[in-house]
Design a protein with these regions (language model features):
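Short charge-dense sequence patches
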Residues: 6-8, 17-20, 24, 31-32, ...
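Catalytic micro-motifs at enzyme active sites that drive phosphoryl/nucleotidyl and oxygen chemistry
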Residues: 137-140, 255-256, 375-377
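Short beta-strand elements that form the blades of beta-propeller/WD-repeat-like
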Residues: 21-24, 28, 33-36, 71-93, ...
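Helix N-terminus capping/helix-initiation residues
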Residues: 340-341, 364, 428, 534
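Amphipathic alpha-helical assembly segments used for oligomerization, scaffolding, or translocation
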Residues: 406-544
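Long, compositionally biased low-complexity segments enriched in polar/charged residues
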Residues: 2-25, 52, 65-71, 78
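Surface-exposed loop/turn elements that mediate protein-protein interactions on large endomembrane-trafficking
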Residues: 33-63, 92-129, 159-203, 225-251, ...
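Signature of short aromatic-glycine-proline-rich micro-motifs recurring in repeat-based ectodomains
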Residues: 66-68, 132-140
Length: 544
């Protein structure tokens, strides 16, 4: 290559690379402006519709007559039923007060009341008979399904050996007893909100390093001594983006079992090597990264609006954010989701049948984050959004600490004195929240490096979707969100072409470096086999 050619290419590299950097800075500038306007809109939204932040209000103690192990807690309007288990010893008969206490919750304190609300004669007969005929009876928990309250008791050695008392929850917050034959109605929802697809024989690719093709996007195998996940359909190479050892080194491709679920940018994988338990992984196509997460064996739930996947110890977003929390408890099953009235916050509840533990995970669709999970043995939510929960003591006690948090999980939206002609009021809180969430997704994309697959194409698509979906986006009352969005779209469109130029430059530079390195390596090899009488001959040899 001539000196002039080299100089020209270097100048082009600097020019085109500089243009690309200018576009990146422009995107960042418009992103900063979008943040300012979103914050202004959020403040205005809260003034109109009100806002409830998650904060610790107080801690109180529920006091019981006997030493006991707390089991669960349930709110009925402003009343609260507390369930527990007392060591009976030589006591011949179990009374209702040996298992339940009733409290009125006011002023962040619990005030004991009579058990009149559940002193139904038919229920009392069934209750006494249960303790008479089943020696190892223990109260487990409350659950509410379709306006019915279920009191669940364990009556045998297995966790599936249960007796369930069913109550109808009346509109006036009273309870009407139904029966003790409803155990079959108490079951958890589907633990996967997607279907695992098993790979078929026609997905196998034979070769020196055979693998199974997952929709021609991902390639997996358990041969050659390790489990490998690849992103190239290349059976001549055994290298991939992720690998870990398997127990049986000599297994064939047919010996393993492979399952997958297509979740957009994410692909969930369930791979069972020969004579081993299944291993679980999540692949992100945008970042081309793999994370192992064996808690997927227990359950996995979709986040709202296609944001990604949540499980009992973490979550994985479509945009690549992955978070695993320290509290990892195997065997947690998905029980329910609770949605705030404005659609901004989602509470995901996971339950462990053997240990009677709950994990509560609150996800905010605007911030697209899960706050620190709550691990507890019992929880309940009052209509005003006050969440009460407790951790059971290891030893029986008369005093049980209850933490009380204010949360956005109210029964109804906060009531504010607002002008019904207010433009934001006419739009509606949920619509604004959804638009803000989509704008925050754009902001997350702006933080990505250009190694993120199709980054600028995604920015163009996302900004176009927001601009086309919300008629109010260009109004002054919503702070003209369309302006920074249009600028981001314009800059991203330009960046697509410029980034292709930069990629070509980088690839060309990479090839030149590889070529020069190869020549240098050959030259150094020759010098080892050649004798030089003086330094001038050595320098001349290198120059040629």
């Amino acid at each position: 290559m001539s000196e002039n050619t080299s100089t020209n290419q270097q100048n082009n590299t600097q020019l085109e690379g500089g243009t690309y950097e200018i576009i990146r800075k422009r995107l960042q500038k418009h992103g900063d402006e979008l943040i300012v306007r979103l914050n202004n809109l959020n403040d205005a939204r809260k003034n109109v519709f009100g806002a409830v932040e998650t904060t610790l209000i107080a801690s109180d103690r529920i006091s019981t007559e006997n030493n006991c192990l707390a089991a669960d807690i349930l709110a009925l309007d402003n009343l609260c039923i507390f369930g527990y288990n007392v060591y009976m010893g030589l006591k011949s008969e179990v009374h209702l007060s040996d298992v339940f206490s009733l409290y009125e919750f006011s002023g962040n304190n619990f005030h004991e009341k009579s058990l009149e609300i559940i002193e139904d004669e038919h229920f009392l007969d069934d209750f006494r008979n249960m303790y008479r005929y089943y020696r190892h009876t223990a109260f487990v928990r409350f659950t509410i399904l379709n306006a019915h309250l279920y009191m669940i008791f364990k009556i045998g050695k297995n966790h599936s050996d249960i007796k369930v008392f069913k109550w109808m929850m009346q509109a006036d917050n009273t309870l009407q007893y139904i029966d003790d034959r409803s155990a079959s109605e108490v079951r958890l929802p589907e633990q996967y909100e997607f279907e695992w697809q098993r790979t078929k024989r026609d997905m196998h690719r034979n070769g020196k390093h055979p693998h199974v093709s997952i929709q021609d996007r991902l390639f997996v195998e358990t041969v050659g001594g390790d489990l490998t996940i690849k992103i190239e359909d290349n059976t001549q190479s055994g290298k991939g983006i992720y690998a870990e050892d398997v127990q049986y080194k000599e297994q064939s491709l047919d010996d393993g079992e492979y399952f997958f679920a297509d979740l957009g940018n994410l692909i969930a994988l369930k791979i069972r090597p020969y004579r081993e338990p299944a291993r679980y992984f999540i692949y992100n196509a945008k970042l081309q990264t793999v994370k192992r997460s064996d808690t997927l064996e227990d359950s996995a739930v979709l986040l709202p609006d296609g944001h990604g996947l949540i499980f009992s110890d973490g979550y994985f977003l479509q945009t690549g954010e992955f978070k695993r929390f320290d509290k990892q408890i195997r065997g947690m099953r998905f029980e329910k989701r609770i949605v705030s009235p404005n659609g901004e916050d989602y509470l995901f509840v996971f339950y462990h049948q053997a240990t009677s533990e709950y994990i509560l995970m609150s996800y905010n669709i605007i911030d697209q984050k899960v706050s620190t999970p709550i691990l507890c043995n019992g929880y309940t939510c009052f209509p005003n959004g006050e969440l009460c929960y407790f951790r059971a003591e290891k030893e029986p006690t008369k005093h049980h600490v209850i933490q009380i948090w204010q949360t956005p999980y109210t029964k109804n939206e906060p009531i504010t004195n607002v002008d019904k002609d207010n433009f934001l009021f006419k739009i509606g809180n949920k619509d604004i929240v959804r638009a803000m969430a989509e704008c925050h997704e754009i902001l997350k994309l702006l933080q990505k490096q250009d190694s993120y697959s199709n980054l600028y194409g995604d920015l163009v698509k996302e900004t176009t979707d927001v601009l086309d979906s919300y008629y109010w986006i260009d109004k002054s009352d919503t702070f003209l969100l369309n302006e920074p969005l249009l600028e981001i779209k314009k800059a991203a469109t330009t960046a697509i072409d410029e980034f292709e130029k930069v990629k070509r430059i980088r690839q060309n530079t990479k090839e030149q470096v590889a070529n020069i390195s190869k020549k240098a390596e050959g030259l150094f090899t020759k010098t080892k086999r050649t004798r030089f009488d003086d330094i001038d001959k050595y320098v001349q040899f290198l120059a040629n």
